[in-house]
Amino acid sequence: MINTTFYARRLHSLVGLLALGGFLMEHILTNASALGGAEALNGKLAMMELIPKPIFLGLEIGAVAIPFLFHAIYGIYICMQAKNNPTKYGYLNNWNFAFQRWTAWFLLVFLVWHVGYLRCYVKGVLGTPITYELIQSYVTSSPIVFVLYLIGMLAAIFHFTNGIATFLMTWGVVKGPRAQKVAGLLSMMLCAALSLVTIAFMVSYFVPMH
């Protein structure tokens, strides 16, 4: 008998790492161009617009939307089964396990809002191109929007980087307590680095650094 749960969990982690992790990294690196000002970010966004619309839409659906739906739906199933007891046990791994689930729930709501507004409504319905000026106006329009956007980005970064360590353990790449501890430490270092970059480009919309 085929163990469907075994393969589903591995596919879930693989999709999260490659498809969604790749999209997050592209998102962060592109937005980091804002540190160089409007011209730098608009130049990056203009390069993406050079991709033919049918191909770009196909990539959005096939490489992002469908993997996200699978990761989200199966992730909800995992969350519903998970039992988090960070305060009872107090171990770092258990806290990471809990935060992985908590950020998953938050990200589900955040991405519906963020993608629904910017990609589907502003760009899709209104036909307004995404530019530095638009993003700046968006994130500085209200302290609530800024805080929610920043928390959403940081939650996505933690979910991704902690997911890397989980992926390495799930797939048997790192074995033993020492190797797993090193993997966890490296993933948190990456989390800190990406978080600092994100905070920097978010703040730059208020105080240009170029």
Protein language model regions, located:
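Membrane-embedded alpha-helical bundles that constitute the cytochrome b-like, heme-associated redox core
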Residues: 1-210
